[in-house]
């Protein structure tokens, strides 16, 4: 899940922190990728007629299809991916995981009912909600990556936290995940949409943590406190506290301790803090996650030549993939992993920082654009209301 509405908060208050661009812009870069999040997205997105792809024996293959072709796309564009798999979840996350399991059980029941009485759209909707990544999915993806010559490592707990460690140490350029909590783990740069399909035509979003903190006028501790208020994987949010309120409360009070104190002493009782809300524990998990140091032996990785025949055996003979496509993909892997070794020019030039005036100008333009959008929406809503109120047959 990550952090609710965090991207919206960043877009509205720190627009200079987000850069959108083409995948080709990342040529020659090493990137640590949140494997579990990627596999989950493959299981949801890689489908045929609303159903997951299956082998002749009835085994799901969507995760393998996604992992093979999306990794191939990255390597074709000169990126050197390193996948990081989740370990055991922190104890504090068990409550959120239990809720997700319950929601999936409800979705499974609704899916079965939809198959009997529902439309094709309802069947697909509930089918997507039943998706979960299993140990078998992870094991098969690890096997595939090994045969492709693409490295992976196992994190002690949260993959995003381990990706952040590698990015801070300079072993990779960035951490890639759809989970915004990667920024809470102090990833200097977060890439989103990197493992999306080419057909979706979604630009790669590059989010810089230092610019986020600068734009929000917060230090990292305040940023983490705001993210906990927004709602994270470890705690449910405080009812009625939305993104604007969370930002306002941290800016006004400076820390969660003072926010909690202000809420509890408010005679109007505008907000009610949940009975079991151990925010200090959640904060500790963001500040001191269970990770391995970047120079730990288990964080060593290298890219190797693909084992083409073993890939064909696994994907074609075992999983029913098209042999010509697999061989063609393996040949591209072999060629392009070598090409990705070329240095980027940015290694020789220091980027020029924006002046305060340039930053203020960017912020002003963004604010003006937001105001214009709000004004247009207000006018459209007013026009709709007037159209409804107009009596039928009136000229």
Swiss-Prot record:
Binds 2 magnesium ions per subunit. They probably participate in the reaction catalyzed by the enzyme. May bind an additional third magnesium ion after substrate binding. SUPFAM superfamilies: 5' to 3' exonuclease, C-terminal subdomain, PIN domain-like. Phosphorylated. Phosphorylation upon DNA damage induces relocalization to the nuclear plasma. Residues 1-104 are annotated as: N-domain. It holds the Pfam family XPG_I. Residues 341-349 are annotated as: Interaction with PCNA. Its cofactor is Mg(2+). It is an enzyme of class 3 (hydrolase). It is found in: Nucleus, Nucleolus; Nucleus, Nucleoplasm; Mitochondrion. GO terms for molecular function: 5'-3' exonuclease activity; 5'-flap endonuclease activity; DNA binding; magnesium ion binding. GO terms for cellular component: mitochondrion; nucleolus; nucleoplasm. Its EC number is 3.1.-.-. Mg(2+) 1 binds at residues 34, 86, 158, 160. Residues 356-395 are annotated as: Disordered. DNA binds at residues 47, 70, 158, 231, 233. Mg(2+) 2 binds at residues 179, 181, 233. Keywords: DNA damage, DNA repair, DNA replication, Endonuclease, Exonuclease, Hydrolase, Magnesium, Metal-binding, Mitochondrion, Nuclease, Nucleus, Phosphoprotein. CDD domains: H3TH_FEN1-Euk, PIN_FEN1. Residues 356-389 have a biased composition (Basic and acidic residues). It comes from the Eukaryota. GO terms for biological process: base-excision repair; DNA replication, removal of RNA primer. Residues 122-253 are annotated as: I-domain. Belongs to the XPG/RAD2 endonuclease family. FEN1 subfamily. Structure-specific nuclease with 5'-flap endonuclease and 5'-3' exonuclease activities involved in DNA replication and repair. During DNA replication, cleaves the 5'-overhanging flap structure that is generated by displacement synthesis when DNA polymerase encounters the 5'-end of a downstream Okazaki fragment. It enters the flap from the 5'-end and then tracks to cleave the flap base, leaving a nick for ligation. Also involved in the long patch base excision repair (LP-BER) pathway, by cleaving within the apurinic/apyrimidinic (AP) site-terminated flap. HAMAP family: Fen. This is Flap endonuclease 1. It comes from Aspergillus clavatus (strain ATCC 1007 / CBS 513.65 / DSM 816 / NCTC 3887 / NRRL 1 / QM 1276 / 107).
């Amino acid at each position: 899940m990550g952090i609710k509405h965090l991207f919206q908060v960043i877009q509205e208050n720190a627009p200079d922190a987000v850069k959108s661009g083409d995948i080709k812009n990342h040529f020659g870069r090493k990137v640590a990728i949140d494997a579990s999040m990627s596999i989950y997205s493959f299981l949801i997105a890689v489908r045929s007629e609303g159903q997951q792809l299956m082998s002749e024996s009835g085994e799901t293959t969507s995760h393998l299809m996604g992992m093979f072709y999306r990794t191939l796309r990255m390597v074709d564009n000169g990126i050197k991916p390193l996948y990081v798999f989740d370990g055991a979840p922190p104890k504090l996350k068990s409550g959120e995981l239990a809720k997700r399991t319950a929601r999936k059980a409800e979705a499974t029941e609704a899916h079965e009912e939809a198959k009997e009485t529902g439309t094709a759209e309802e069947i697909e909707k509930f089918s997507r909600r039943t998706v979960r990544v299993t140990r078998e999915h992870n094991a098969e993806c690890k096997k595939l990556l090994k045969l492709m010559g693409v490295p992976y490592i196992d994190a002690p707990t949260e993959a995003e936290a381990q990706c952040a460690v590698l990015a801070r140490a300079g072993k990779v350029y960035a951490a890639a995940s759809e989970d915004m909590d990667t920024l809470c783990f102090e990833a200097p740069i977060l890439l989103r949409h990197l493992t999306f399909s080419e057909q979706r035509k979604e630009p790669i979003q590059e989010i810089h943590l230092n610019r986020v903190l600068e734009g929000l006028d917060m230090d990292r501790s305040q940023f983490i406190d705001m993210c906990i208020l927004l709602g994270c994987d470890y705690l449910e949010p405080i009812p009625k506290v939305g993104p604007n309120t969370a930002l306002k409360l941290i800016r006004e009070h400076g820390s969660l301790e003072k926010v909690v104190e202000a809420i509890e002493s408010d005679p109007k009782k505008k907000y009610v803090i949940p009975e079991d809300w151990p925010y200090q524990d959640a904060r500790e998990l963001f500040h001191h996650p269970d990770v391995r140091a970047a120079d730990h032996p288990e964080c060593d990785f290298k890219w190797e030549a693909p084992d083409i025949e073993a890939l064909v055996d696994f994907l074609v003979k075992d999983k029913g993939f098209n042999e010509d496509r697999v061989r063609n993909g393996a040949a591209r892997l072999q060629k392009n992993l070598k090409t990705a070794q070329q240095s980027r020019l940015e290694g020789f030039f220091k980027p020029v920082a924006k002046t305060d005036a340039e930053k203020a100008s960017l912020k002003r333009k963004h604010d003006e654009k937001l105001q214009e959008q709000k004004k247009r929406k207000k006018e459209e809503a007013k026009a709709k209301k007037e159209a409804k109120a107009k009596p039928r047959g009136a000229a």
